[in-house]
């Protein structure tokens, strides 16, 4: 079973979209196996976005991502990395299809509601930055045998 890292950004939290977004993923059949709510420490942001540290847009992005609380969580399911990326929609909301999270809710490319890992390798890296192994919970959903067998 594959896992991915997802983060609802400050604009998504402040607009009251956490429940709606979580419902979309759960309704798709994915399982939430970890979650944290709060304002990110700058050291976590620097680790998470280390590939962007030297880029000119990084200070503004860092200021935004630490401007309010985020909800970070780990989803588990078959092909979860690629499916979550499709459900999120294009990074630029003007290019995101209606019905996707960004197509329905994002207001700008800078404030686009949600982040998700772009590959299984990135997911493992990001999960390791935000969660300890002990924080990842294994359990069986009542309907899981019907979804994955």
Swiss-Prot record:
One of its GO terms (cellular component) is cytoplasm. The keyword Nucleotide-binding applies. Keywords: ATP-binding, Cytoplasm, Kinase, Magnesium, Metal-binding, Nucleotide metabolism, Nucleotide-binding, Phosphoprotein, Transferase. It is found in: Cytoplasm. It is an enzyme of class 2 (transferase). InterPro entries: NDK-like_dom, NDK-like_dom_sf, Nucleoside_diP_kinase. Its main location: cytoplasm. The active site is at residue 115. Its cofactor is Mg(2+). ATP binds at residues 9, 57, 85, 91, 102, 112. It holds the Pfam family NDK. SUPFAM superfamilies: Nucleoside diphosphate kinase, NDK. GO terms for biological process: CTP biosynthetic process; GTP biosynthetic process; UTP biosynthetic process. It catalyses: a 2'-deoxyribonucleoside 5'-diphosphate + ATP = a 2'-deoxyribonucleoside 5'-triphosphate + ADP; a ribonucleoside 5'-diphosphate + ATP = a ribonucleoside 5'-triphosphate + ADP. Major role in the synthesis of nucleoside triphosphates other than ATP. The ATP gamma phosphate is transferred to the NDP beta phosphate via a ping-pong mechanism, using a phosphorylated active-site intermediate. This is Nucleoside diphosphate kinase.
């Amino acid at each position: 079973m594959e896992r991915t890292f997802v983060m609802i950004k400050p604009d998504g939290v402040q607009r009251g979209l956490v429940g709606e977004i979580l419902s979309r993923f759960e309704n798709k059949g994915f399982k939430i196996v970890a979650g944290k709510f709060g304002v990110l420490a700058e050291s976590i942001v620097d680790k998470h976005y280390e590939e962007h540290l030297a880029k000119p847009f990084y200070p503004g992005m860092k200021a935004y991502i630490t401007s309010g609380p985020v909800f970070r969580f780990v989803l588990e399911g078959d092909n979860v990395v690629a499916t979550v990326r499709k459900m999120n929609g294009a990074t630029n909301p003007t290019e995101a299809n209606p019905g996707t999270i960004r197509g329905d809710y994002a207001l700008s490319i800078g404030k686009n509601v949600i982040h998700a890992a772009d590959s299984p390798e990135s997911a493992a890296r990001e999960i390791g930055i935000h969660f300890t192994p002990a924080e990842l919970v294994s359990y069986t959903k009542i309907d899981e045998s019907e979804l994955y067998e």
